[in-house]
Amino acid sequence: MDFIFSSDRSHEGVIRSRIMEIETPETSRMTVTSGAWGTCVATGSQYSFGALDSESDLLMVLGDPLGERSARRDSGISDVPLEAHPGSRLHEYLVDGGMEHPSAIVRLSKSTRSIDLVTDVYLGIPIFFRVDRGVVMLASSPDLLAGILPTSFDADSAIERLSMGFISSPHTLYTEIKALPPASVIRIEADGTVRDRKWWQPPLPDESADVADLREELHASILSTLRRIDSRHPGQSGAFTLSAGLDSRFMVTMALKEQVCDFTAVNLALGSNIPARTAAHVARRAHVPLISIRRPTDFYSRLLLNGHPEIGTNACIADAHFADRALGELEGAQYLVGGFSADEMLKGSSSSGQYAAVREVAQSGEPLPRLATYPQLIDITPTIASMLDSRQTQARRSLGMSESHSSLADHVSLHRASFGHFAAATRNYAVYEPFMTRRLIELSYRIPDAVKTRVPKSYWYQPYLGGQETGRLFSTRVKAERLFRRATGIGLKQQGEWVQSEGPLWKECLVAAESARSRLSAELGHEITMKGKRRPMALTLSTAEALQRCT
């Protein structure tokens, strides 16, 4: 769903044009709601979009990927009542927490021209806002707002996006446009003054928690969600995403062993064919039917030719539209189950290690070698390192986090890419993300960072993985062979497609990795460490320069 709201009704024409520029399958399902308070244009979807217009105010409901009503008066469905400022009527509405999925509610007062926004713990639809000379604008994407009023490019955000892969909340690529924080009540006055307060705070890490108990809680939450999905679709079949990662394997094997949900595994190969090959192997072992869907190879070339920048949100939204069209053609699939965000919840945010590196650089004054990240290489200087560290601090503050909280504090920024999956314009099936529930969000904060670092991710998914947690694909091993030939001269035997941790080839990889590590450490005069015992091919960023010397 795409939507743009403006408190200035004269913007209706340009808003319509801006919405039409987004490549959606059915732009004809556009909904326009106008009044004395302004205008709102939204594309139709199974995401609920409701507008309750009265003499005193307008109440808009955004979100709920379950395809049901997102708000019901006095229904008592959710245990998280919406809060609001005194005098508002938001407290009469409750978020539909049927699957503990996110929602947001917007209230516009016609008399005071103020806006109240209530955001859930996990923003299923990202909401961005801009205030310009008394005009308040909201949208589901910063790119949508950027085309209506003049904007200036935020160079710091661009550097952060290119070097870290995301932009810290509440910043965007545009200086004037900000992202709304989760679990907050935000009031925007008619003069542009913004006030916000938190209605939920994440728990602090439980240093005394038993890891086995945390794992059992994780299993209980996921299984409970799968059973609720099954009960929502009695006698109907669905689809489970299956990629190269452990998360989707865990979801598939749990559903099979616990005999919940009738489903077909689906692999969406939007880029590399490695996930498709991994999914095919896992599906064969699990005896699950698999459908692989690949995007045309020239898609991104056409996207760039059409003027859509890769570092914005257009590519992500286009991926979502492609996935929606493809999944909509699956016969008999009434719902989709995915496994986004598990990495951040069980292993800490993917950016935490990089931020630790740039903080160290900022303190030492020594520049890092180029940071190899998509879509290009960035020179990390002490100035950039200090800027990134400052942005992380701002992001934590805007999200109400403290240094004692888990590194998941920047989860809102990190999941913009995942939420692009939810931003597609049309959908004829329900989408469920069992990892994106309030129960698991709280669990992720309770897990100490030391545990996330020490405990291998495969541990959280036992005993459901059944020996499939340590496999490596042949195509991945070809890349590893080239690396070790450069570093050690030791070639890897290419025996079979799947490598188990107990096999001789895996042990040979460990020996080769340790040999390369020792030799490069001695050559550079400082210790080089591995990312983990179960990843012998992956060396840390500090070895990039050393590996170049081995070519």
Which stretches of residues belong to each language-model region?
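Short, surface-exposed acidic
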Residues: 153-155, 467-476
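ATP-dependent adenylate-handling active sites, centered on carboxylate activation for C-N bond formation
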Residues: 9-13, 114, 124, 190, ...
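Core structural elements
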Residues: 408-420
